[in-house]
């Protein structure tokens, strides 16, 4: 079965890393993947190519809307002859549907929505427009995949309605993300930490939705309670972001490490004593599951399906409540290493049993087979969408 994955970019982020994990986990003797990006950038391009998977790009600039790129997408998809086009995130979802009328009727299209949506006005202007246009297109795709129950409910309320709307959560590589004493020792040595330090980390790119500011406010409050606490921010932009840099000169001076983007995330997490997710909007946070798989106590904000993932194996605090977050950080620190390890062991077991990448990949595989069976067996006609390219597709190709 040929599957084309269409995604905005392959910079390191939650959706992009989930795609990489899915590509690793799916049976290559059964599924033949190709990846197409809207924007030609990102550290994960070479990671995917090293897996022997072709990566192509429409070479769009960020924020650009281009009929030329749509014609190029149609050309690529026709040449690839996919059985299923799996798109990832709003922009790629809309692009897949815009190309759909020029593909064979047997080709299925599945959207993947990767975030919750609490307030559309907080999104960039172009993203707002793309989300709104998605309401018109969503009923006509073959499947609407959300990575959280909350996301599905929120998008349904604004008009994302589809007969096959389902939740497939993020999956986690428990063999890669695991407790690793050697990695813990080497990473903490790199940071110059002694054995008594309690290292609390956020692993997330800088974006308003990740709310690093709330984490830093909580860190300042918790640091005043416990002198052993040391804090860490890892992820794209954390080493240059103004609020993060400012914190280096404030109450967290000498107790905050800003690492920027890291490719050795399992090693970073192995060195932590607890992980925090301070996000304001998420679907099913990758960092939460990865931290739990590493055997860490995790504190997450009550957004998306974070509460469902953590369950009894961590702590959940109200979104944006720095005082509550600080209190939980201080409380976990006070428990001591042995008790934190017990909580972390329970967290890892929960991920292993309920959120392994193997089980998630199996669900995607079944979905693709269902789509193909329906398209080839029912004779269902593709919805008639308004032509988008500036000239007829055949002339463009």
Question: Which residues does each predicted region cover?
Answer:
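Short, structured helix-loop element that forms part of the nucleotide-activated donor/catalytic region
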Residues: 42-50, 225, 230-255
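Short hydrophobic beta-strand element within catalytic cores of glycosyltransferases
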Residues: 37, 297-300
